């Protein structure tokens, strides 16, 4: 089972360079591919980032709002136009504003080609946005996205074309089997909606095995998507704690492997 990592980025070049240096230090030999979705005219500012990547793909220009809500389509375009030519069994999807302080294998030891692991995965009917750990969810549906017009469009489309159970997720990263990437990239383009429910629902409908669990209490204490950005002092304090499943998100500032003790 050979992993690769897709590093998605669009701003803060120096921070991106330091993230990649940390990833390289913690995961020697790991292929790391880049997906740039920023302004085309600013790609030249990221020459140092590109030097640290095994490959770099530039996504066609889109608004920040579109890119955020269609992250699954962004990744699928990368796979169709570039990723399918790279060898890997499963793919880590890692955004530039995430900092992992432990090797990837501490979080996910391995994955089969037809599997998906999303830490926040749960049935849509049980999505309580107040509870991050899906295994501790109240089972009561409370999610603001369900009130958006685009969800109604998705729901209508889903009933007509699939009708299978709906899933959703809010996660700091995703780990996707290669076969999942291939099937999804062929089928996703006509499906309306938002990536946080479209991706897991469609992946499952296409035969992916969805995985849950495997994350420590420390992981869920550290991951708070709505928190204020981590400060450098907070990150350095966490870096001095014992290894485990340590992560910081969002964290926007550069910090070197030497500072972190990697």
What residues fall within each predicted segment?
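A conserved hydrophobic helix/loop-capping motif in glycosyltransferases and polysaccharide synthases
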Residues: 4-12
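Active-site-proximal specificity loops/subdomain of glycosyltransferases
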Residues: 36-89
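Short beta-strand-to-loop acidic/aromatic patch adjacent to the donor-nucleotide binding site
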Residues: 87-97
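Short acidic, S/G/P-rich loop/turn micro-motifs used as interaction or catalytic elements
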Residues: 11-15, 41, 97-101
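Short, well-formed alpha-helical segments that are part of the catalytic scaffolds
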Residues: 12-26
